[in-house]
Design a protein with these regions (language model features):
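Single-stranded RNA-binding regions, centering on S1/OB-family and related RNA-binding modules
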Residues: 1-96
Length: 96
């Protein structure tokens, strides 16, 4: 079972103009809506990932009965480790 705030590893399975579809595990699927991809304007969701690519996403809504997750990559390092971007930026500032 997943809960809001969890960071999940997932694999990109498809695209629609409104978002990125992912598979989390054998039971769960998810959608990263276009509004949860970036704080900047997103013209084409395909610019952010590729089919089959492993990414990380943050759970913003979970329907554990239907095994569907609404996900966000807006504030995390979705290509690497799924950690909040702000934390990484703060650490870089501290190192200077």
């Amino acid at each position: 079972m997943y809960k809001v705030g969890d960071i999940v590893q997932c694999f990109v399975t498809g695209f629609k103009e409104y978002g990125i579809f992912v598979k989390i595990d054998n039971n769960y699927n998810g959608l990263i809506h276009i509004s949860e991809i970036s704080s900047d304007f997103v013209n084409n969701v395909k610019e952010y990932a590729e089919i089959g690519e492993k990414i990380y996403a943050k759970v913003i809504e979970a329907d554990n009965n239907a095994k569907l997750l609404k996900l966000s990559i807006k504030t995390i390092d979705y290509k690497n480790d799924g950690k909040e971007r702000k934390e990484k930026e703060e650490k870089k500032q501290e190192e200077k």
